[in-house]
Amino acid sequence: MSDIAERVKKIVIDHLGVDADKVVEGASFIDDLGADSLDTVELVMAFEEEFGVEIPDDAADSILTVGDAVKFIEKAQA
Amino acid sequence: MFDLTGRKALVTGATGGLGEEIARMLHKQGAVVGLHGTRVEKLEALAAELGDRVKIFPANLSDRAEVKALGEKAEAELGGVDILVNNAGITKDGLFVRMSDEDWDSVLEVNLTAVFRLTRELTHPMMRRRHGRIINITSVVGVTGNPGQTNYCASKAGMIGFSKSLAQEIATRNVTVNCVAPGFIESAMTGKLNEKQKEAILGAIPMKRMGAGSDIAAAVLYLASDEAGYVTGQTIHVNGGMAMI
């Protein structure tokens, strides 16, 4: 796993209080990890803070899984 | 009951009569209190009088950058704001047909937009901590209206709608958002009224007297307390029966 993926995973675990083994690339924040709509907003804000990137609302709407988040951040930092 | 030991509160407009009473009450119940105001000397005097557990935060609420900075500073220096009391407010009264853009804008800016901006700064950390109390001081006239105060009443009614919406958004995070709506309260503002005006006002109040700042502070204290954890999106009217809503 890349460094970014590790950091994303840690944020998700901390924020949602879920088991580490559930936080896999294809895990959906809402369907698999029990997040509500506020959680997803908070996660996006946490990613922005951690990685110093800006995630616009329309991009945020397309970040549905752990893998989506990692991909977006990798792209934004490239 | 209503013990605030360990809680950190920020009260805006703490140099005004009402804000000062609110700050005193929260402090008395054990909270660390951040006093916001525009007059540094008055803030320092009140802080000195209260003694421990007090910090002052001078800021101009009509300056948007200062509002943001106030939120950041209070959050950092108080070590997390648990209780936010949006009390600061101004009036620029005048009959509607003669109301200037400036009088409209300045009242909405301080009474409503600053509330939005400051609350936005402090809400997210509250959500993270899964605890928070946001208490907005509105007014009976925000519900009943009052001639000569279209701007003020719009801002106070706006505060109520704002509070209800935000309350619904963040209820699952244990952050409550409520309003306290004072009626006529003895203050520097009402002290300026002449006898005839006073008589007319008292005639409309079943209790035949004006309220005291401490009456409002007590309602704020309740909403700030752990005991009020199941109360959100509400407006508590404290007005001697003047309007029963």
UniProtKB/Swiss-Prot annotation, chain A:
Disulfide bonds: none annotated. The gene is acpP. The lineage of its organism: Bacteria, Pseudomonadati, Pseudomonadota, Alphaproteobacteria, Hyphomicrobiales. It is found in: Cytoplasm. Carrier of the growing fatty acid chain in fatty acid biosynthesis. InterPro entries: ACP (IPR003231), ACP-like_sf (IPR036736), PKS_PP-bd (IPR020806), PP-bd_ACP (IPR009081), Ppantetheine_attach_site (IPR006162). This is Acyl carrier protein AcpP. Its main location: cytoplasm. PANTHER family: ACYL CARRIER PROTEIN, CARRIER DOMAIN-CONTAINING PROTEIN. 4'-phosphopantetheine is transferred from CoA to a specific serine of apo-ACP by AcpS. This modification is essential for activity because fatty acids are bound in thioester linkage to the sulfhydryl of the prosthetic group.
